[in-house]
Amino acid sequence: MTKQNPIADAMSAIKNAGDTGKLAVTVEPASRLFGDMLKVMQEYGYITGFEKIDDGRGGQFQIALSGGINKCGVITPRFSVKVEDLESWEIRYLPGKGFGIIILTTSKGVMSHEQARKLGVGGELLGYVF
């Protein structure tokens, strides 16, 4: 059976593993987009590391959790946002100003809403972590 939204399934697996106190989780399939999202999460300390494992079927990510994730999820549909509108989405998905990140894909790559604001670029919303 195919997965309808592999990124949503992976974010849910990360949240569930964190809620149960696990220090590692394996998610599949491994995609380049989700790998870029994991890099952003690692930059902000939400995960300690990850490794892509090629199993010949679609790959897997072995993710080491830091225990700092309260909630994470995807934003569907992937809304296009301008840099001026990022604050309204921040209010909608994050519990407080400066607490957590919204991950978005831009013409300059996958980054947090803070980095996008500094660079002055908009993009499509992918998910949130806090």
From Swiss-Prot:
Gene Ontology CC terms: ribonucleoprotein complex; ribosome
Record Gene3D superfamilies: 3.30.1370.30, 3.30.1490.10
Role, per record: One of the primary rRNA binding proteins, it binds directly to 16S rRNA central domain where it helps coordinate assembly of the platform of the 30S subunit.
HAMAP family to which the protein is assigned, alphabetical: Ribosomal_uS8_A
Subunit text: Part of the 30S ribosomal subunit.
Similarity comment: Belongs to the universal ribosomal protein uS8 family.
Name of the molecule in the record: Small ribosomal subunit protein uS8
